[in-house]
């Protein structure tokens, strides 16, 4: 038994009879960036909630849309107000600008480039956000009504303010295109 233990002890510290040298410890090269977020939190395959028989995810309807101003009603960012920048329909999550920031440690791409610590906006469940009126500074549930011209719109129940307008939607889509072009140009 003693011979077996001594042979295992030799295996753990050597490789074919050669001793390993201790690892060199280099000072960490960490750089914090305060610029625009170029990294997005990707959804892992195992994070899907439900699947259809054809293996596609079930898409859920949500009470918020891209470009809506929302207030966080639960979680560690409770009370913060921000604009929705991305919607993930198959798990009912949204990404709100400057809310739910997570720290991401990014490896260097080449040896001479240092690694980075970057803050990214992680998704938050849509049930934890509520539509917010900038004018009256109040959060409200959403209602649906049909206007005189037959168009269905969303409105805030507390204030009666109509959320859906063509200008807001075009503005949100243009901002989304600008950010994707900036990310594509940077990489």
From Swiss-Prot:
It comes from the Eukaryota. Keywords: Chloroplast, Plastid, Ribonucleoprotein, Ribosomal protein, RNA-binding, rRNA-binding, Transit peptide. Residues 1-41 form a transit peptide. GO terms for biological process: translation. InterPro entries: KOW, Rib_uL2_dom2, Ribosomal_uL24, Ribosomal_uL24_CS, Ribosomal_uL24_KOW, Translation_prot_SH3-like_sf. Transmembrane segments: none annotated. Its main location: plastid. It holds the Pfam family KOW. The keyword Protein biosynthesis does not apply. One of two assembly initiator proteins, it binds directly to the 5'-end of the 23S rRNA, where it nucleates assembly of the 50S subunit. PANTHER family: MITOCHONDRIAL RIBOSOMAL PROTEIN L24. Belongs to the universal ribosomal protein uL24 family. This is Large ribosomal subunit protein uL24c. It comes from Nicotiana tabacum (Common tobacco).
